[in-house]
A protein has these predicted regions:
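Glycine-rich phosphate/adenosyl-contacting loop at the front of the ribokinase-like
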Residues: 1-50
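Glycine-rich phosphate/dinucleotide-binding loop and adjoining beta-alpha-beta core of small-molecule
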Residues: 57-128
Length: 128
């Protein structure tokens, strides 16, 4: 287990690395949080790229660093975009974060979340 000081030191070092490399951080997120997510990425030195379309998601998976996928407010296009992006991330060996908002609500959301198991997100974000 890490001490608070060790955690603080690791966070500071990670932010310094991000600022020096300015990685592209792709996001497929919901309309409620899109500005917050982009601004958070920019604040720590990332280069935010928010996308909706399947080909854009695949491009980000190959060109960018890590990707954030949030299923909070689904749009019909996400039925194609999310699985294609997750597959491309998996095939490229890129890290990605899944925020599985509202698990079990609706057939589309449930179907998408089941598909993600095959592509093994690096981190699954959850609210406590």
């Amino acid at each position: 287990m890490y001490t608070n000081e060790e955690i603080k030191s690791q966070v500071i070092e990670a932010v310094k690395k991000v600022k020096s490399s300015n990685p592209m951080a792709g996001s497929i997120t919901n309309s409620v949080t899109i500005n917050f997510v982009a601004n958070a990425q920019l604040a720590v030195g990332g280069s935010a790229a928010m996308v909706y379309l399947p080909d854009e998601g695949e491009f980000l998976a190959n060109a960018g660093g890590a990707t954030y996928i949030n299923v909070g407010t689904l749009m019909p296009i996400y039925e194609e975009t999310l699985p294609r992006t997750a597959k491309a991330l998996h095939e490229a060996g890129k890290p990605w974060v899944l925020d599985p908002v509202a698990i079990g609500i609706g057939d589309l959301r449930t179907s998408l979340l089941k598909q993600f198991k095959e592509y093994k997100p690096t981190i699954i974000r959850g609210n406590a």
